[in-house]
């Protein structure tokens, strides 16, 4: 297979990226827990994905495939966090209204748990792989691995570790193949 071109996501690609992530995560354990109603999950997930990708683009940590966008990697970049201004500009500040009270409380509970691991089990500074999603029609073709490469290469150059969390046991083999190790198994 030839090399898959991966680029910094452009703001013109955010809408497509949000739809792809919503498709990729519509059956994910995290979002099925947060948004248990399958009839409302996709639109809420699409809003969240677009807003989160936009905020992360403003912070400089989103990579994607060239047009058409078929995969996205959202990274937390050391020294370039998503700020309150990014959240406000992107619409993330309206997430409680988009999700509804119960779903937003479940979301915050999960995020707070994951954030509690940083510093305790996760060294800082680090690169944080927040979201890696590939359109279901394009999975299994090497896009996920290609999407990881720019940030992994930069982290290696900077001598910094990378961190992610997954609730999907089926994803562990993929991440291990790309150099990640399990630090915490909190099943």
Q: What residue ranges belong to the model's regions?
A:
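Conserved GNAT acetyl-CoA-binding A-motif
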Residues: 125-127, 154-167
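A short beta-loop-alpha structural element at the N-terminal edge
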Residues: 5-19
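Conserved acetyl-CoA-binding loop-helix of GNAT-fold acetyltransferases
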Residues: 131-134, 140-153, 177
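Active-site rim helix/loop that mediates acceptor-substrate recognition in acyltransferases
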Residues: 38-61
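Conserved acyl-donor/pantetheine-binding loop and adjacent beta-alpha core of acyl/acetyltransferases
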Residues: 72-133, 139
